[in-house]
């Protein structure tokens, strides 16, 4: 995530290489419509080439971009700070908001439930969140979510499942089977 004030298109590959020791092939970026920032990311060169020649004007979107827009909108209506966590297979996305203001965003790889607990509690502490009033919103595999929620309740007062936005239900029941980032992209 690069602040819009310092982002320059010609330097995005350098920024990606600085942030990641081995960035993926093609360097791309997405302007975040709700934040004064640009999301810089890498895409496998073969995937990029295949999509570019097989699709008409493909649009490449980082999976976190639509989630950030969704969470910003949700957090504006909430007084306490929100820590949003989406659990994927071996990766988790984490973002912290205070009344619509993005405080933190990152993705972490994990192998065990303990890794998830560590990252959540570490980000919670670093963001200066209050254990008694701020909220953790979790989305992902239900058994894994239940397992970590039981432990997190020893440390945090408000832990809720992250619900699929109500607008998604208007698109039909099949949409509910899609990953959250695809649902957020369609809203």
Regions found by a protein language model. Give the residues of each.
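Hydrophobic/aromatic-enriched cytosolic interaction surfaces used to assemble or bind macromolecules
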Residues: 1-187
């Amino acid at each position: 995530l690069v602040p819009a004030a310092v982002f320059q298109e010609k330097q995005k590959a350098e920024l990606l290489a600085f942030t990641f020791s081995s960035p993926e092939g093609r360097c791309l970026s997405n302007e975040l419509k709700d934040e004064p920032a640009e999301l810089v990311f890498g895409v496998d060169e073969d995937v990029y080439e295949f999509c570019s020649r097989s699709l008409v004007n493909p649009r490449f979107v980082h999976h976190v971009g639509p989630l950030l827009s969704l969470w910003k909108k949700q957090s504006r209506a909430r007084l306490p700070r929100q820590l949003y966590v989406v659990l994927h297979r071996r990766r988790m996305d984490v973002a912290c908001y205070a009344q619509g203001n993005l405080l933190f965003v990152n993705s972490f790889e994990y192998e065990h439930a303990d890794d998830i607990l560590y990252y959540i509690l570490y980000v919670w502490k670093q963001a200066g969140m209050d254990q008694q009033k701020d909220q953790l919103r979790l989305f992902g595999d239900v058994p894994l979510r239940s397992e970590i929620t039981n432990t997190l309740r020893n440390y945090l007062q408000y832990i809720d499942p992250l619900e699929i936005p109500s607008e998604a239900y208007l698109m039909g029941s099949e949409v509910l089977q899609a990953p959250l980032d695809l649902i957020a992209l369609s809203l």
